[in-house]
Amino acid sequence: MAVAAATRIAVVVVVLALAVLAPAARGLRRDDFPPGFLFGAATSAYQIEGAYLDDNKGLNNWDVFTHTQAGRISDGRNGDVADDHYHRYTEDVDILHNLGVNSYRFSISWARILPRGRLGGVNSAGIAFYNRLINALLQKGIQPFVTLNHFDIPHELETRYGGWLGAAIREEFEYYSDVCFNAFGDRVRFWTTFNEPNLSTRHQYILGEFPPNHCSPPFGNCSSGDSRREPYAAAHNILLSHAAAVHNYKTNYQAKQGGSIGIVIAVKWYEPLTNSTEDVRAARRALAFEVDWFLDPIFFGDYPREMREILSSNLPKFTPEEKKLLQNNKVDFIGINHYTAIYAKDCIYSPCTLDTYEGNALVYAIGRRNGKIIGKPTALHGYFVVPEAMEKVVMYVNDRYRNTTIYITENGYSQHSDTSMEDLINDVERVNYMHDYLKYLSSAIRKGANVGGYFAWSIVDNFEWVYGYTVKFGLYQVDFDTQERIPRMSAKWYRDFLTSSSLTDGLQVRSRRADS
């Protein structure tokens, strides 16, 4: 153990030296971003908190899923302990403070606040934990940026209503959000209702990878589900839950608390596979099914034309009253989680295998064109390094949704957990990824995009859903046996970028041996 610890320390020392000596040719300054710009890091409750039964917390859907279907997780593990953030939050707040960020994005565990939903009573211990976390952040000058729902719901709501497939869950979410606004809103200036509902519903109800694991052919062979209908029924209930929460916040809390509220959407950029009209339209159609699916109803009161034409009766319809609720309660900002880009091939006029989640859009997504890959692969399947896509995504959302303020609420680089310790710590690829994506973000801002902040995913390695602990996104390496947090080269680079007025650059050097 002593030898291993000494090796880790030696690696960290070399990492810091490499970061200090890195060349600064292309240049990126914090001053390239507007005054008041938020720079932070992000996490979510299930992925880092642990303490899955502590202090009267109820079981959530991921607790049950990872315990009953461990074979669906790459390493068979779960979030029972994860980063033990519930007990180590003060250490993690200190890490954030030392990093120099001015905001921290985290989510609240619904089952920690309302273990059985609105019928079971509020858990005072859950309220107390998030009060302690929020207060600790504010004492360090860090703004909480709070997500109400990041994939996890109380298990009882899954069994009682069928989760997001049941319309009754809308009232549950409105009640839960009200409890949070009332308990924490005097200190929270940034709220988001949902994280990536456009991604979670597809993994839940098209591919069947996330609980409740519903799907149908050609996407999979689940025991139940309808991949053509259920994702859109669930999304419909999420959108109306969102609208009810936003209406409540704007009516009863915003004026006296002074905060803002939005929603976070996962945005993958789609490039046409060829220059053909069909593939150009396919790329546009993929974006409609990716982005416009949730944002068009919020801004324009209805689903995009492409979805209505293709899905027909499988796409629910809003009543006039529901359209009014959506349009009269627009978000104050849009959160974008952006990581990658991919090619889009038309499947209306060309034969395709429609088994990716773009299949319902009659699009086939592929990472290669003419034998050349779109960007360097990362540890997540289908995720490539394509920095210029950041600018394209931001400009698309900015232009379509009327210059509404945008926050990049997630952006990060994944490594395989079986990478050598030296390369995990000397994460040159992550440094270059962050530098290059930030450069294209600053370019979008110069072109007029209204962007208010950037959050790196993630501050620490954590439980990465069906990948378990087999991939690592953290600026800090975590030893899950000891819970030791070890700064990576990317943490040093990010801190230098945030605290220095001088030019910083990506590291165009290769990792060196720790003992060289």
UniProtKB/Swiss-Prot annotation:
Catalytic reaction(s) noted: Hydrolysis of terminal, non-reducing beta-D-glucosyl residues with release of beta-D-glucose
| Listed EC numbers | 3.2.1.21
Q: Which residues are glycosylated?
A: N198, N221, N275, N403
Which family is this protein grouped under? Belongs to the glycosyl hydrolase 1 family.
Q: In which tissues is it expressed?
A: Expressed in leaves, stems and endosperm.
Per the UniProt record, the source organism is Oryza sativa subsp. japonica
Tell me the Gene3D superfamilies matching this sequence: Glycosidases
Q: How does activity depend on temperature?
A: Optimum temperature is 45 degrees Celsius with para-nitrophenyl beta-D-glucopyranoside (pNPGlc) as substrate.
What InterPro entries has UniProt attached to this entry? Answer: Glyco_hydro_1 (IPR001360), Glyco_hydro_1_N_CS (IPR033132), Glycoside_hydrolase_SF (IPR017853)
State the name under which the record lists this protein. Answer: Beta-glucosidase 16
The pH profile of the activity is: Optimum pH is 6.5 with para-nitrophenyl beta-D-glucopyranoside (pNPGlc) as substrate.
Q: Enumerate the UniProt keywords alphabetically.
A: Disulfide bond, Glycoprotein, Glycosidase, Hydrolase, Signal
Paired cysteines (S-S):
C215-C222, C347-C352
One GO BP on record is: glycoside metabolic process
According to the UniProt record, what class of enzyme is this? hydrolase
SUPFAM superfamilies assigned: (Trans)glycosidases
For the keyword Disulfide bond, the answer is yes
The GO terms describing molecular function are: beta-D-fucosidase activity; beta-galactosidase activity; beta-glucosidase activity; coniferin beta-glucosidase activity
Which residues does UniProt assign to the signal peptide? 1-27
Physiological role:
Hydrolyzes glycosides and monolignol glucosides. Can hydrolyze para-nitrophenyl beta-D-glucopyranoside (pNPGlc) in vitro. Hydrolyzes para-nitrophenyl beta-D-fucopyranoside, para-nitrophenyl beta-D-galactopyranoside and para-nitrophenyl beta-D-xylopyranoside in vitro. Hydrolyzes the monolignol glucosides coniferin and syringin with high catalytic efficiencies.
